[in-house]
Amino acid sequence: MARYGVAVVKIGGSIASRLERVADEIAVLAREGLRLVVVHGGGKVVDEYSRRMGVEPRYVLHPSGVRSRYTSWEELEVYVMVMAGLLATSISSELASRGLKVLSLTGLDGLSVEARRRERIVIVNERGRPQAIPGGYTGKIERVDSMFVGSMLQQVDVILYSPVAYGREGDRVVALNVDGDQMAASLSAALKAPLALVTDVPGVILDGRVVDRIRVSEAREIAAKAGVGMNRKILMAAKAVSEGSPYAAIGDPPIQSLINGEKGTLVTRS
């Protein structure tokens, strides 16, 4: 694979729990001159703090088989507090401790990641039937300000993005929950950079074997056979590649091998 000057890395909540190892890897890559945009997850931590604050987390299943968080206003407050506060600070501290200059952002900063709030969403109800419900405070990303992100990357080693975008309600700008894989895919497409979706499994596994390569045209078919969670990663990787990223890799560390397209499941145009 060709060498790129910028890469986008998504670290899920399970990987973030092994933060020291991840921070070590990111530090090595940054010292080698690679500029990194890192998107973090942390849904389990959000769930933990939601329950502490008396807000029971709610998840919904979509007809596509994708499972997502349902974000009420109360849940949004906890989500932003944990993602953009507690977790972002913890990850930034680890990276800064390794001598890296880190800029921690959400999509509201610089109005850099814009999403459209979903007024209605279709879910699968308890009877297994499609049902439309209010969309809550969840968004679908529609725009990334690549010039802003690119200019910030010239000044730091790592940009750390929490999966929070901004939306508009009349004259008001509001925070919206966006899926971390979606945010990473949108950033990599806008920056035309490789995407590494780092997980705790070696790649997309079907029939007991890691799938080496998925073409964009095959993504929906293969996602339908993958488990909940992995199906979203496949779809978001395909979205990134179809919209500008040269390729995306799904798998476990080392992160550099994923960025180079040397391991995991590679998602490509053809």
Swiss-Prot record:
- Is-annotated flag, keyword NADP? no
* BP GO terms, sorted: arginine biosynthetic process via ornithine; L-arginine biosynthetic process; lysine biosynthetic process via aminoadipic acid
Can you say where in the cell this protein is located?
A: Cytoplasm
Record-level Gene Ontology MF annotations: acetylglutamate kinase activity; ATP binding; N2-acetyl-L-aminoadipate kinase activity
Which terms are listed as keywords in the entry? Amino-acid biosynthesis, Arginine biosynthesis, ATP-binding, Cytoplasm, Kinase, Lysine biosynthesis, Nucleotide-binding, Transferase
Q: Which reaction is catalysed here?
A: [amino-group carrier protein]-C-terminal-N-(1,4-dicarboxybutan-1-yl)-L-glutamine + ATP = [amino-group carrier protein]-C-terminal-N-(1-carboxy-5-phosphooxy-5-oxopentan-1-yl)-L-glutamine + ADP; [amino-group carrier protein]-C-terminal-gamma-(L-glutamyl)-L-glutamate + ATP = [amino-group carrier protein]-C-terminal-gamma-(5-phospho-L-glutamyl)-L-glutamate + ADP
Instruction: Quote the EC number.
Output: 2.7.2.17, 2.7.2.19
Per the record, its GO cellular-component terms are:
cytoplasm
Indicate the annotated site residue(s) for Transition state stabilizer. 10, 233
Task: List residues binding substrate.
Answer: 42-43, 69, 177
Q: Which InterPro entries has this protein been placed in?
A: AceGlu_kinase-like_sf (IPR036393), AcgluKinase_fam (IPR004662), Asp/Glu/Uridylate_kinase (IPR001048), LysZ (IPR037529)
Cleaved signal peptide residues:
none
Pathway where it operates:
Amino-acid biosynthesis; L-lysine biosynthesis via AAA pathway; L-lysine from L-alpha-aminoadipate (Thermus route): step 2/5; Amino-acid biosynthesis; L-arginine biosynthesis
Principal subcellular localisation of the protein: cytoplasm
A Pfam family annotated for this UniProt entry:
AA_kinase
What does this chain do? Answer: Involved in both the arginine and lysine biosynthetic pathways. Phosphorylates the LysW-bound precursors glutamate (for arginine biosynthesis), respectively alpha-aminoadipate (for lysine biosynthesis).
Q: Per the similarity annotation, which family is this?
A: Belongs to the acetylglutamate kinase family. LysZ subfamily.
**HAMAP family documented for this protein:** LysZ
UniProt-listed PANTHER family: N-ACETYLGLUTAMATE SYNTHASE, N-ACETYLGLUTAMATE SYNTHASE, MITOCHONDRIAL
Name of the protein: Putative [LysW]-aminoadipate/[LysW]-glutamate kinase
Record organism: Aeropyrum pernix (strain ATCC 700893 / DSM 11879 / JCM 9820 / NBRC 100138 / K1)
